[in-house]
């Protein structure tokens, strides 16, 4: 009997210590004050694909339309399927401009028309009682030249286009070069004016913490790599008043903010590769 009681107590002690350990490992989410939060469709997961650029750029286009009162939900699966069937496509990786090029080439369909890449591609797209070909539908949600890609580098002249030498830029797309401070102010103004924005940058830094849902510049290396794309859907401030962009990611919803992430202005200044936003917002 004594052995049984001791064993039972040991079990209870084990469960208690396990609970305390898990509690100590859990992180209390940081508190942010939301200044601007633009509309967006549900956060998705890109799974094992390299299509973050497609998720992010389509999310920016969706936000642009949602804030204009349109109900738009777009299919990444369509783009994935069309690329897989195109022998000229060199890589599944890409940049925001890659998505714009792809829908210009293949067209686009609504999310409900094709949710998975192995679904049968529809011949037509239907929205608000109208029937479109995929090319017509793509043009209706994103006209050619509607978006521009901005970058910032000291190695090229400002206020001019340059071709970034990046593995993901296998199409040799160009970015319009602006000073870093201008890139930040243009992006912030776009979000405040309720426009959709796609961000591309370095997420390999220790300061980028997906599990906590926060990216800060406190721990940053000197080099910048082109790792990931996200949509910018809002603006916020932390408890100390530091400004942040609210990012819509494509890694599912298992973080403290249901798939959103708060990225500091300091991180943006030092780790941005490109930003894609409506061309009308940029004076050239």
Q: What is each of the regions a protein language model found here?
A:
Residues 72-139:
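Papain-like cysteine protease catalytic cores
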Residues 11-16:
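Sec-dependent signal peptide recognition
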Residues 28, 41, 130-284:
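Active-site signature of cysteine proteases
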């Amino acid at each position: 009997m004594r052995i049984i009681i001791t064993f039972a107590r040991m079990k209870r002690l084990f469960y208690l210590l396990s609970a305390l350990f898990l509690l100590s490992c859990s992180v209390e989410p940081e508190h942010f004050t939301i200044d601007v939060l633009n509309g967006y469709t549900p956060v998705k997961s890109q799974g094992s694909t390299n299509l973050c650029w497609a998720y992010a750029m389509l999310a920016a286009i969706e936000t642009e339309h949602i804030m204009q009162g349109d109900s738009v939900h777009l299919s990444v699966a369509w783009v994935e399927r069309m690329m897989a069937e195109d022998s000229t496509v060199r890589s599944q990786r890409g940049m925001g401009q890659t998505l714009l090029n792809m829908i210009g080439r293949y067209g686009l369909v609504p999310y409900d028309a094709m949710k998975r890449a192995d679904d049968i591609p529809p011949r037509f797209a239907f929205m608000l009682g109208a029937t479109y070909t995929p090319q017509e539908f793509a043009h209706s949600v994103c006209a050619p030249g509607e978006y521009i890609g901005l970058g910032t580098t000291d190695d090229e002249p400002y206020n001019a286009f340059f071709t970034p030498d990046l593995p993901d830029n296998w199409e040799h797309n160009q970015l319009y070069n602006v000073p870093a401070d201008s890139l930040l102010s243009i992006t912030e103004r776009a979000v405040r004016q309720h426009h959709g924005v796609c961000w591309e940058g370095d997420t390999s830094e220790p300061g980028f913490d997906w599990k906590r849902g926060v990216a800060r510049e406190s721990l940053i290396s000197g080099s910048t790599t082109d790792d990931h794309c996200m949509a910018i859907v809002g603006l916020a401030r932390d408890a100390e008043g530091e400004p942040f962009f609210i990012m819509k990611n494509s890694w599912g919803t298992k973080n403290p903010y249901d798939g959103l992430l708060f990225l500091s202005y300091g991180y943006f200044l030092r780790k941005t590769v490109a930003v894609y936003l409506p061309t009308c917002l940029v004076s050239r």
